[in-house]
Amino acid sequence: MGDITANFSRDEFALPASKALEYGFRGVEYPEEWVESRLRPLCRALEVLRDKLGGRRVRVISGYRPKAYDLARLAAGRRGVSPNSQHHEGRAVDLQVRGVEPAQVYATVLELVEQGLIKVGGVGVYDEFVHVDIRPNEGPVKTWDERSR
């Protein structure tokens, strides 16, 4: 049971202490001031995705990350870290769905957007997960494919 929506809780979107300590941070909670304006709309979109995928569990791989954390990761040589990520603004999630390939999750998110059932600003697919964000966006949804070929 979630405290934001039926299946998602604020804790899932916090930076876990185990990851934070790796780069000299303590566990980082999702900012309270963004819960209603950012996290709740994101979780509502994830609920629609979950329902479309037959109620399968949507696992949050990464939610909110402070910019300083990602900059520390970049300084340590980590690849694939954006200095301007929507994660810094509490508007993004990287996720996996048990039993569903990331390419299918990606296609399903885009289908839901096309049908007008969810509103997102960006969707990207990677080998192991899908990124979904609710960036402010008046134009078309930003999409990308970062899978290895």
Predicted segments, located by residue:
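Surface-exposed loop/turn and secondary-structure junction residues enriched for glycine/proline
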Residues: 16-18, 67, 72, 76, ...
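Amphipathic alpha-helical interface surfaces
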Residues: 38, 42-45, 69, 91, ...
